[in-house]
Amino acid sequence: MEFVATCMPGLADLLSDELGSLGISVTETGRAHVSFSGGVADALKVCLWSRLSERVLLHLATLGVTPDIAPEKLAASQDWLSLVGNNAPVHLHIEHGAEVRGDNRISAKRFIHALPEQFAISREPKGSCCIRARLDLNEAHLWLDLAGEPLHRRGYRLAGGRAPLRETLAAAILWAVGWGKEGRHSALIDPFCGSGTLVIEAALIAAGRAAGAQRQHYGFQQWRGCRRQLWLDAQKEAGESGKRPVPAVSLKGFDSEASTLQLALQNAERAGVRNAIHFERRELGALRRRDFVDNGIVVGNPPWGERLEEKPQAGWLHYALGRILSVRAPGYQALLLGADAEVMDRSGMNLEQQWRLKNGPFNNFIRLYSPRKQTPANVVKVADDSAFNVPEGAQPLLNRLRKNGKHLRRWLEREDIQCYRLYDRDLPEFNVAVDIYADQVLVQEFKAPKTIDPEKAKERRDWAVTAVRAALGVHREQVHLRTREKQKGNQQYQKLDAQGQYRVVREGQSQLLINLQDYLDTGLFLDHRPTRLRIAEEASGKRFLNLFAYTGSATVHAAVGGAKRTVTVDSSKRYLDWAACNLAANGFSTDQHELARADTMRWLDECKEQFDLVFCDPPTFSNNKSRSDFVVEEHHGDLIRKIMRCLEPGGVLYFSCNYRRFQMDESISKWYAVEDISRWSIPEDFRRNEKIHYCYAIRHVEDA
């Protein structure tokens, strides 16, 4: 007898291998099917044991007819009374080939009218004799569907999360990497487990249980060609396999959503593998080296970023996965499902193998990666000597850069700092700031007054760039030049370009995105480094609130430090999107780390939540279309009072301001315990300007 096992398009080679391992005689492998020959027992074996098959079809007829007569001809080609069991309803599915016009429902009605009158027609495959037909231009095909309901319905997953993974696809992912084969892997982690399908299938495969061990209904039960005793024997063998214990392998499923994990626990319970799997609410960024054991693999279905606005976040989440594996589990492999090869390659890992498939409307990839060895970041520092010949006019700046570099060298090494300010308008004739971002240099020229000859200003600018290159020994491509002038309102955030070229730098244990092309500001205020690092130290187990959050770098530090919840508030969509990417680059999602686009003052008026740790760094001045403008000198008292209403007893507010003539509202000091930590909060590389910002730790009086 000739049978066809169907699968997702692109997985037929994997299915063919699986059927061969079951002792099935494969005769043909297509893109979405595998043909095999054998007896009824072989067909039942595939139905019960194959984890990759979607359906098992018995070929009944192929007729050389056109679609206008095909339904009646197909119906007339079979002795239905000898094919269908007594009183069994018939479930029919007819599909049209791509070139066949017309409604397939009309073809189905014509087929049904041509069947013997005693047959009842059912809309449901369960409990029915299932017939499938396909009409092409010059051919018509007829099959008996021995599976009935699709075989991915194992019986344990009654509900899924936001993007549930089909069981057959999960099994194909695992089969691709040889999961369950002796000596291949001793551990499996799914950091995006959702409702648990991948890790549950991994447990069932490791135990050697039949895919259909828990299923009670198949299409072949209503087929006269299947003897009842044959079915009972096959069912008994499959059922007994369902009692096999899961061997001693490490199986872990992590997810950020508690409700989804609850589904995973319920599904694992129904599958009989609950005690074999460790499920935990934890985000990718919270995985530690101890979570990985030798000879393991990470499998997962990370967010694809199918919507355009989600694509950057998905890419940075893949980046985080690659970085985490390279640092914490360099011996692991990663087997990932995705829809965009470019997004998946953002992981930075080495691509070992891939499979292409069609998953409903999506073109998908299964990709096997291995981590790349993590190389230390190259942080540019002042060189002891230089091959550059600088103009005489640039020599004073070169000397000052070398002096500053020598002063900062030991501090930079001791504190392990990648991003710092090397020079800040120390010399009147060089009105620039020089910031180092790992292996890149940002030179910010403060626009010369109109009284200065433009040609002279340009010459000084060129000298500055030459001196920087000579002092640091960098190529021209590593130096980024910007011109700043006195800003009004939100002009400091004005767009310069639209290249979207983000780079990653490290601060403490956090990975932060900077942009040296598109905006005047890079996305990271270097002078707040000590405060951000303190937030990371204090955040464990706390609820963190970040107001006027900009790109959310403080939020990232809180998340990396173990905050149980964070809320990030800013009025700019652009910077909240940036914050989302910052979180993703560290392995955190916006499920547990809320991003709120809102006016901060109004958001505080409506806030009902309490926080243990708050960071607020308001601008000196901010335009607002929906209310009066925000002026920090006038409004900071009201702002702080609103924040303190949301601050839990025992909590602390870190309030910062870069207004040079700032003076704290006296009423704040009367009502709250205010500690001026400005001197502590200004790092060594900014000590030349003690008014770069003011910073205060504010607590409730009873906590002081």
Swiss-Prot record:
EC code: 2.1.1.173, 2.1.1.264
Annotated keywords: Cytoplasm, Methyltransferase, rRNA processing, S-adenosyl-L-methionine, Transferase
InterPro entries recorded: 23SrRNA_methyltr_KL, DNA_methylase_N6_adenine_CS, RlmKL-like_Mtase, RlmKL-like_Mtase_CS, RlmL_1st, SAM-dep_methyl-trfase, SAM-dependent_MTases_sf
Cellular localisation: Cytoplasm
Gene Ontology, cellular component aspect: cytoplasm
GO molecular function, one term: nucleic acid binding
Alphabetized CDD domains for the sequence: AdoMet_MTases, THUMP_AdoMetMT
Domain of life: Bacteria
Catalytically driven reaction(s): guanosine(2445) in 23S rRNA + S-adenosyl-L-methionine = N(2)-methylguanosine(2445) in 23S rRNA + S-adenosyl-L-homocysteine + H(+); guanosine(2069) in 23S rRNA + S-adenosyl-L-methionine = N(2)-methylguanosine(2069) in 23S rRNA + S-adenosyl-L-homocysteine + H(+)
Listed NCBIfam families: PRK11783.1
Function of the protein: Specifically methylates the guanine in position 2445 (m2G2445) and the guanine in position 2069 (m7G2069) of 23S rRNA.
HAMAP family: 23SrRNA_methyltr_KL
Name this protein carries in UniProt: Ribosomal RNA large subunit methyltransferase K/L
Source lineage: Bacteria, Pseudomonadati, Pseudomonadota, Gammaproteobacteria, Oceanospirillales
Gene that specifies this protein: rlmL
